[in-house]
C-alpha cells in the first residue's frame, strides 16, 4: 500500500491469453521450503509455455525472513496469516495484509500459498483448500488441491484471517500447501513443491505441458482436532506426523523439570496426525498436536482402471491372466526367488507384465 512494502517478485506474462495465477511464499518468514520453491519456480518456468500470467512473490514477510523472526511480525509480534484482509492504518502486519489483499490478490484468477510447519513444528505434507466461499470457488479450490502430491487434504472452514481464506471469500479459488518444517528445507521438498505448482498450472491450462508423476492422491481429512498445551512444560511426543492413531491412545505427555506429569495428550478419535510440536518445550495455550479423521470416499479411479482393461479385451479376466503369466513374468519370477531370504518362508503371490509396466505382488510369510 502506497509503496511501503517492497517484495521480491517475478511476473511471467505469456504471449498467449489466459488466466492469472498468484503464488506466494514467506507469509511466515521461517517457512523455507515454499520460499526456495518460489525462487526456483521463477527461474525454471519457461515463459514461452505460459498462457496468461504467473505472479510469484518469493517472500511476503520480508522483515521477519531477513531477521529470522519466524512467523511473527518484527515490530508488532502479530501472525500475518491471522490478519487478512488487514487494515491500511493498523500495525505493520495489518498493513501488509491489507496491501496483499488489495494490491496482489485482485489481479489473480487463482491463488497458491506455500507454507511449512513453523520452526518448532513437524508435519506430514498436506494441502488445505478454501471451503468458505461460493460453491464454484470451493469446487475449483478442491480440484486444485487434488493435483497436489500429498497424502491428505483438508477443507478450511474459515473465510478470513488467512491469506488464501480471504482470497477465496472474494471469489478466487485458493489453496495452501504444507511441506517441511522445523526451520529447515531440503532439495527434495523444494522439488516436490515445484512439481505440485507446475502440475496445478498445467491442470488449469496456464502452463503448457504434461503433468508430472505423482505418488499420492490426497484423501480428505476432517474434524481437525488442534490440541493446545494447558501450561508451559516439556513435551514428549509418542508419535510422528503421518502416524495413524486410535481413539483413547496417548499421543504424548507434558512434564515438569523434575519429571512430574503435568498433562497427557489423548486421541479423541481414530485418525492421522497432521503436525505436532517438535521441540522439547511447549507453551501454555500453544500448539501441541493436530490430527483429524480420514474420510474414504468412493474412488472413481478403480472404475477407470477396470474400464481401461475391458476396452483392451472382450474377456478382461482371460486377458489379464495371460499377461500375468507371460514368459517374461516367469523369467522374473525365477530371478526374484533367488533373492528372497530362505529363513523367512516367503512366497510370491503374483508377478505380472503389462503394456508399459511390470508389477510384482510379493511376499507373504507362511
Named regions from a protein language model:
Residues 40, 199, 335-338, 361:
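Residue-level signal for well-ordered alpha-helical scaffold segments within enzymatic catalytic domains
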Residues 355-365:
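Conserved SAM-binding loop of SAM-dependent methyltransferases across substrates and taxa
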Residues 298-341, 345-352:
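Conserved class I S-adenosyl-L-methionine
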Residues 43-47, 338, 342, 364:
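Secondary-structure boundary motif
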Residues 1-300:
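Structured catalytic-domain cores with a bias toward divalent-metal coordination
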Residues 52, 344-345:
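Short acidic capping loops at alpha-helix termini that bridge into adjacent secondary structure
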Amino acid at each position: 500500500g502506497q509503496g511501503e512494502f517492497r517484495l521480491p517478485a517475478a511476473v511471467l506474462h505469456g504471449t498467449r491469453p489466459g488466466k492469472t495465477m498468484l503464488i506466494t511464499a514467506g507469509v511466515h518468514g521461517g517457512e523455507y521450503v515454499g520460499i526456495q520453491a518460489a525462487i526456483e519456480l521463477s527461474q525454471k518456468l519457461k515463459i514461452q509455455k505460459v498462457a496468461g500470467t504467473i505472479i510469484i512473490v518469493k517472500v511476503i514477510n520480508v522483515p521477519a525472513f531477513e531477521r529470522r523472526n519466524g512467523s511473527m511480525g518484527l515490530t508488532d509480534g502479530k501472525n500475518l496469516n491471522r490478519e487478512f484482509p488487514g487494515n491500511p492504518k493498523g500495525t505493520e502486519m495489518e498493513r501488509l495484509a491489507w496491501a496483499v489483499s488489495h494490491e496482489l490478490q485482485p489481479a489473480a484468477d487463482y491463488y497458491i500459498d506455500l507454507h511449512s510447519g513453523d520452526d518448532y513444528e513437524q508435519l506430514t505434507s498436506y494441502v488445505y483448500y478454501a471451503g468458505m466461499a461460493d460453491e464454484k470457488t470451493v469446487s475449483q479450490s478442491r480440484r486444485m488441491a487434488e493435483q497436489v502430491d500429498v497424502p491428505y487434504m483438508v477443507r478450511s472452514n474459515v473465510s478470513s484471517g488467512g491469506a488464501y481464506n480471504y482470497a477465496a471469500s472474494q471469489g478466487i479459488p485458493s489453496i495452501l500447501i504444507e511441506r517441511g518444517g522445523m526451520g529447515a528445507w531440503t532439495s527434495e521438498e523444494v522439488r516436490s513443491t515445484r512439481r505440485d505448482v507446475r502440475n496445478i498450472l498445467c491442470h488449469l491450462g496456464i502452463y503448457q505441458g504434461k503433468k508430472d508423476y505423482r505418488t499420492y492422491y490426497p484423501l480428505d481429512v476432517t474434524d481437525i482436532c488442534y490440541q493446545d498445551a494447558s501450561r508451559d512444560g516439556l513435551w514428549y511426543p509418542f508419535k510422528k506426523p503421518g502416524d495413524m492413531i486410535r481413539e483413547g491412545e496417548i499421543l504424548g505427555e507434558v512434564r515438569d523439570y523434575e519429571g512430574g506429569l503435568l498433562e497427557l495428550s489423548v486421541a479423541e478419535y481414530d485418525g492421522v496426525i497432521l503436525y505436532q510440536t517438535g521441540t522439547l518445550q511447549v507453551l501454555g495455550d500453544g500448539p501441541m498436536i493436530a490430527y483429524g479423521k480420514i474420510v474414504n470416499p468412493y474412488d472413481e479411479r478403480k472404475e477407470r482402471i477396470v474400464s481401461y482393461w475391458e476396452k483392451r479385451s472382450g474377456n478382461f479376466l482371460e486377458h489379464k491372466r495371460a499377461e500375468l503369466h507371460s514368459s517374461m513374468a516367469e523369467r522374473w519370477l525365477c530371478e526374484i526367488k533367488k533373492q528372497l531370504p530362505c529363513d523367512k518362508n516367503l512366497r510370491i503371490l503374483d508377478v505380472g507384465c503389462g503394456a508399459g509396466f511390470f508389477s510384482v505382488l510379493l511376499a507373504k510369510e507362511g
